[in-house]
């Protein structure tokens, strides 16, 4: 099996890190969070095309309590997160045993996950595939360092993990929300 560069980078740093927007709203990946020996690889990933979702992969997410309704794209690299919520390649598909890992920005490109910190246990996270919807219920929220990749580990039951930078406009930590399948 060939190791993909994105998977290698994500094995040492969680997705979503970027520099604060400049006066024109431009931003870029936060290279300070990336180990120096992996920096050339990260820079080379900028133009990788976004894969098309298979029928059982996530295509949309809704989180009613924080007014999220956004597309889900495959991959969680810089270019993918410009288009919506990114599903970590290699994570489980919705409804399957394992961990569906989804990430999005909190302060650029739609600020999709800006209000993850407002989620409380019992809130719903609805994930759509081309075939059906899956309702997950929030269990807990934690703050971690960008290198805490263990939050993306596979699980023995159907779960979803939502990841974004935190706090707003500072982004030196990650907020991680865990939810379990309800239906």
Regions found by a protein language model. Name each.
Residues 1-183:
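Solvent-exposed, non-transmembrane regions of membrane-associated and secreted proteins
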């Amino acid at each position: 099996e060939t190791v993909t560069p994105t998977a290698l980078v994500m094995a040492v740093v969680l997705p979503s890190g970027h520099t604060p927007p400049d006066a024109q709203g431009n931003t870029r990946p936060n290279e300070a969070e990336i180990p120096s020996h992996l920096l050339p690889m990260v820079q080379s990933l900028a133009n990788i095309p976004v894969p098309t979702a298979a029928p059982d992969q996530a295509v949309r997410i809704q989180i009613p309590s924080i007014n999220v309704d956004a597309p889900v794209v495959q991959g969680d690299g810089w270019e993918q997160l410009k288009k919506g919520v990114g599903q970590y390649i290699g994570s489980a598909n919705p409804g399957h045993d394992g961990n569906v890992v989804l990430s999005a920005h909190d302060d650029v490109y739609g600020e999709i996950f800006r209000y993850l910190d407002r989620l409380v246990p019992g809130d719903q996270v609805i994930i759509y595939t081309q075939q059906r919807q899956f309702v997950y219920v929030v269990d807990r929220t934690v703050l971690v360092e960008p290198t805490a990749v263990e939050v993306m580990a596979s699980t023995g039951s159907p779960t979803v993990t939502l990841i974004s930078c935190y706090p707003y406009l500072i982004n030196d930590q990650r907020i991680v929300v865990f939810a379990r399948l309800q239906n």
